[in-house]
Amino acid sequence: MAVVKELIREESDGSISFGNYTLAQKAKLEDFEHAGDLYKVKTFSTMTKLEKNGLFLYESVPGTSVSHFQETADGVSFEVEGADDAQLIIGLCDDTQYEVFVAGKSAGKMNTGLGGKLNVSVELAGMGEV
């Protein structure tokens, strides 16, 4: 997987890819339309953030590149790549339990709070995409 030079793009499978962790300066793109929704992405080396229709959807510290991000009724799936290990925050349903998979292996079940945010740490340094 490579960084998303255009900051956000639609994939042929109906998913989106976004983020460029190689940028030294913050870049953003607003009003990207996909499947009737409007997305906003901000990305650079220290942070990547995605909003959908003005609501929080994804954030990573430091910055990452995300490919094939897809929402379903059961949750979200995506692949992520970065130069360093990252803390991911994903906006999901409030007060719900999700099973989290990292590199195809279960990392266990995790709960969101009232804000619907799920926090996951992933080892990315030297790993390629996870």
Task: For every predicted segment, state its role.
Residues 48-83:
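Surface beta-strand/loop "capping" patches
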Residues 27-50, 58-60, 86-90, 112-130:
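C-terminal beta-strand-rich structural cap/linker in extracellular carbohydrate-active enzymes
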Residues 17, 23, 39, 57, ...:
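Short, isolated positions in well-ordered beta-strands
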Residues 1-30:
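Activation corresponds to long, low-complexity, non-globular regions
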Residues 76-78, 100, 130:
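Hydrophobic residues positioned within well-ordered beta-strands of beta-sheet architectures
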Residues 101-105:
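Short strand-turn-strand beta-turns centered on an Asx-Gly dipeptide
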Residues 79-96:
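Surface-exposed beta-strand/loop patches in extracellular or lumenal glycoproteins
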